[in-house]
């Protein structure tokens, strides 16, 4: 889902398993009549899609659209003038939520075909990595193209504070869209093994390096760029 509010000058880029649907439902109410609001599947009460197609009905904007794709449609000048933000989540928690959606969603698993258990999900390695949605490579370096990345764990505080700066008063995240996916609990975070955590965190290394939101050890920090890794491994007190 995508929200572009010309009234409040912001672009919301939806990421995976970060309360994005709930956020979009609430943002769509205050974004303005001329806002771009893409559809939600299945439909959610209180959400009104609008202005996401061309005059002939061809979709210009889509769900889970990347920031770079949005920039292409609205133009670089408009994109740079607007405040772009997204939400990220701790990797293990994010993967657990993704796993429950794959198993319990009547849309994603309509016929019950997806029957993998948690260890099989981890072994497959198809994790909900959203790095390309809010960043891009420039001269070999990964750079963010959004202005803010909000931590999922503190949305109740950070999202209203951000919107307050953009002129939206008394915003509250009330919607609880798709929370039913966790009613049948298949794995608790405490049951995730150390090996599974390492596997997930290895896959999310580039995300962790870019966002800086969650703990990252020295090895991960050195891996952010080959030059930094090269210099960090050079004996102290000598010249390369």
What name fits each language-model region?
Residues 1-240:
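Membrane-interface amphipathic segments in extracytoplasmic regions
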């Amino acid at each position: 889902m995508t929200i572009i509010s010309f009234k409040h000058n912001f672009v919301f880029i939806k990421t995976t398993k970060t309360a994005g649907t709930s956020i979009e439902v609430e943002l769509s109410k205050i974004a303005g009549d001329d806002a771009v609001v893409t559809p939600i599947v299945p439909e959610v009460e209180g959400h009104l899609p609008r202005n996401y197609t061309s005059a002939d009905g061809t979709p210009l904007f889509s769900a889970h659209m990347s920031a770079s794709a949005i920039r292409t449609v609205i133009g670089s000048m408009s994109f740079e003038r607007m405040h772009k933000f997204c939400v990220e989540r701790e990797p293990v928690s994010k993967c657990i939520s993704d796993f429950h959606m794959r198993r319990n969603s009547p849309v994603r698993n309509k016929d019950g075909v997806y029957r993998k258990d948690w260890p099989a999900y981890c072994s497959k390695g198809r994790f909900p990595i959203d790095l390309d949605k809010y960043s891009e490579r420039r001269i070999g370096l990964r750079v963010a193209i959004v202005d803010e990345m909000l931590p999922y764990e503190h949305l109740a505080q950070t999202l209203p504070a951000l919107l307050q700066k953009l002129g939206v008063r008394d915003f509250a995240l009330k919607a609880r869209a798709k929370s039913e996916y966790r009613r049948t609990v298949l794995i608790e975070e405490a049951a995730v093994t150390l090996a599974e955590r390492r596997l997930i965190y290895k896959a999310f290394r580039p995300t962790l390096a870019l966002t800086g939101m969650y703990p990252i050890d020295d090895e991960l920090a050195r891996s952010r760029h080959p030059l930094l890794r090269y210099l960090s491994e050079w004996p102290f007190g000598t010249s390369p």
